[in-house]
């Protein structure tokens, strides 16, 4: 599972997901992409589940790029703990995804295969997504 090797601060504030994604909105590595339409926190487990679903369907043909990285720690207090006494300890890592962000890219497979692979990957994610084809793509 994806997570940073080391971080400057162990705990971060939650923050807000306002507006659209400013960067990472174009298909730049592969020919096909999976674009987020809604804002959400995508956990490292969800990213891994989507990656596995795509790789299995593509039967290890072609190449997959993961364009998001879970670099935000989410803290949680233990069950049945009274309020107060500080912030909980980091439990898992999330990637903050805003609308318009390209999350996955693929290349080296036919368009139909990529479409189905991304459809399977999208089922593993908690947001609505759209299949994107690079503008200069030729069959």
Curated annotation (Swiss-Prot):
InterPro entries linked to this entry: Ribosomal_uL16, Ribosomal_uL16_bact-type, Ribosomal_uL16_CS, Ribosomal_uL16_dom, Ribosomal_uL16_sf
Record text on subunit structure and interactions: Part of the 50S ribosomal subunit.
Source organism: Pelodictyon phaeoclathratiforme (strain DSM 5477 / BU-1)
Function (record text): Binds 23S rRNA and is also seen to make contacts with the A and possibly P site tRNAs.
Positions with biased composition (Basic residues): 1-17
Coiled coil: none
GO CC term, one of those recorded: cytosolic large ribosomal subunit
Key word Ribonucleoprotein present: yes
Pfam families: Ribosomal_L16
Domain of life: Bacteria
GO molecular function: rRNA binding; structural constituent of ribosome; tRNA binding
Family: Belongs to the universal ribosomal protein uL16 family.
Annotated segments matching region Disordered: 1-24
Protein name: Large ribosomal subunit protein uL16
